[in-house]
Amino acid sequence: MIAENIFKKLYLTPAQKKLIVNAPREYLDFLGDLHYDTAVDGKTEGFYDFVQIFATTQAELEHLVKKYGKAGKYDCLFWGCYPKGGGKIKSDIKRDTVWTAFQLVEMHAVTQVSIDDTWSALRARPLDTYKK
C-alpha cells in the first residue's frame, strides 16, 4: 500500500476528524502517525469529517453501519470496507449487500475504490443528496 495513493482515493487528509472502526492491524500500521479515533467515546452525532468501518460479514457490516452511521457530519466521507471476493478473507459481503446496509441509515452508495489486494471500500452519502 502506498499511503499517498490510498489517502487520495479516500479523500483522507490529516486535518479531518477521523473515526476508523474495526480496521485490520496492517491498515492501522499503514496509517502511521495520522490521528484518528477508533470509538465514539461520548462524542455527539455529526462530529466526524471521515468515518471508515471495516467488516468481514454482512451482519457485522449492518451492525457497524447502524452504530456509526450518524457519527459523521452531514455528508461526511463515510466508507464501508469489506473483503474482496475470492481473496484471503472469506466473506458473505458483496458490493450490492453493502448498498443494502447503507439503506438501513438512509444512505446510498456513490463510489467504490480498491484499498489493496484484500479490501474494497464503498462510499455512502445521505439519500437526500441523490440527484434524480
Where are each of the predicted segments found?
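N-terminal, charge-rich interaction modules
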Residues: 1-32
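Acidic/glycine-enriched edge-of-secondary-structure segments
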Residues: 21-31, 46-62
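Short acidic low-complexity segments
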Residues: 37-48
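Beta-hairpin (beta-strand-turn-beta-strand) motif
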Residues: 56, 82-85, 115, 127
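Conserved Class I S-adenosyl-L-methionine
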Residues: 92-112
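Class I S-adenosyl-L-methionine
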Residues: 106-132
